[in-house]
């Protein structure tokens, strides 16, 4: 093998390692229990398990060293301009959402600080949420259909 071929093979191997790797290790700290912090109280009936709801949300990795506990942003329905619609309490979303959104009213905004066990756990999610990551979400409840 020529020197150029060896260098090409080494570069290709390094590129493959980077491309196949997951997110960097999580170092943001742990949330012990699900935290529900009402930022803005809504009006009307409260959301309950089984309701179809529409929400806007933004999600960040939890960062214990940040004043607002928000680390790297990984997703936002607002950025896409499209709310998420799902049936609450049926396991269609992470458990931290199913448990944390119950009781919200239309127009309400709530911050959820979610421990890894109620989020994506030891597996993480794709290349954006590392294994064992605690999460922070700001959720706005747009609509409830009983």
Segments from the language model and where they lie:
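Cross-family detector of peptidyl-prolyl cis-trans isomerase
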Residues: 2-146
């Amino acid at each position: 093998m020529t020197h150029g071929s060896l260098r090409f093979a080494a570069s290709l191997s390094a590129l493959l390692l980077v491309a196949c790797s997951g997110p960097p290790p999580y170092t943001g700290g742990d949330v012990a229990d699900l935290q529900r912090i009402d930022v803005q109280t809504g009006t009307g009936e409260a959301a309950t398990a089984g309701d179809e709801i529409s929400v806007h949300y933004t999600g960040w990795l939890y960062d214990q060293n940040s004043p607002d506990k928000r680390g790297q942003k990984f997703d936002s329905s607002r950025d896409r301009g499209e709310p998420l619609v799902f049936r609450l309490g049926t396991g269609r979303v992470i458990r931290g959402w199913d448990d944390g959104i119950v009781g919200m009213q239309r127009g309400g905004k709530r911050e959820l600080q979610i421990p890894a066990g109620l989020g994506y756990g030891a597996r993480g999610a794709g290349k954006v949420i590392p294994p064992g990551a605690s999460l922070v979400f700001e959720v706005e409840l747009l609509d409830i259909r009983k």
